[in-house]
């Protein structure tokens, strides 16, 4: 399979809040690993966004084209530079619902437009559809580096230091995602209380949802 260059990995999976000059676009990349539960060799690959076709859609089309045995279960792990947009979320949810022999897990280096309500609702939709979404940490960055990057060419940086920095930066992003998930839980509780006609939600509960 084609591998990412070390430079591409270091630039595109960079999870700093702000990047230093020279500025560059942080593009969407999706690395996937499909592992059959019968112990067969995993299948790996990666996709970039193309014009009018996001990496997530290219990934879905690739899995569909494999003609997988629907009597066998598969674990699919995706490492993304950006969390999916709302449109891709809907496609991923529909895909997984139609292929219940696939168990999909998503790990993102960064949260795309996390302050926008539509983006937050997309993340909630994935979690509510039994598609775990988490922020990449030390284990995921190391696995992605090990399995999707070409290590044969000389490096201009220290990989260990890079991975440590990625893990350090990921902590704030993990807290941000956790707040989004918690706000979803509170919204569900509020709706449940209203449907039971138990009156308005207490102000203390509402305050606990402020960010």
UniProtKB/Swiss-Prot annotation:
Reactions catalysed: a 2'-deoxycytidine in single-stranded DNA + H2O + H(+) = a 2'-deoxyuridine in single-stranded DNA + NH4(+)
InterPro entries: APOBEC/CMP_deaminase_Zn-bd (IPR016192), APOBEC3H (IPR041512), APOBEC_Cyt_Deaminase (IPR050610), CMP_dCMP_dom (IPR002125), Cytidine_deaminase-like (IPR016193)
EC number: 3.5.4.38
Alphabetized UniProt keyword annotations: Antiviral defense, Cytoplasm, Hydrolase, Immunity, Innate immunity, Metal-binding, Zinc
Gene3D superfamilies, alphabetized: Cytidine Deaminase, domain 2
GO cellular component: cytoplasm; nucleus; P-body
Domain CMP/dCMP-type deaminase: 4-126
Root EC class: hydrolase
Cofactor(s) this protein cannot do without: Zn(2+)
Keyword Cell membrane: no
Subcellular location: Cytoplasm
Sequence positions that bind Zn(2+): 54, 85, 88
UniProt GO molecular function: cytidine deaminase activity; RNA binding; zinc ion binding
Entry annotated with the keyword Hydrolase: yes
SUPFAM superfamilies for this protein: Cytidine deaminase-like
Signal peptide span: none
Coiled-coil intervals: none
Active site, per annotation: 56
GO biological process: cytidine to uridine editing; defense response to virus; DNA cytosine deamination; innate immune response; negative regulation by host of viral genome replication; negative regulation of single stranded viral RNA replication via double stranded DNA intermediate
Family annotation (CDD domains): cytidine_deaminase
Known role: DNA deaminase (cytidine deaminase) which may act as an inhibitor of retrovirus replication and retrotransposon mobility via deaminase-dependent and -independent mechanisms.
Family: Belongs to the cytidine and deoxycytidylate deaminase family.
Other observations noted: APOBEC3H from old world monkeys has retained its antiviral activity, while it is lost in other primates.
Subunit comment: Homodimer.
UniProt protein name: DNA dC->dU-editing enzyme APOBEC-3H
Organism: Pongo pygmaeus (Bornean orangutan)
Gene label: APOBEC3H
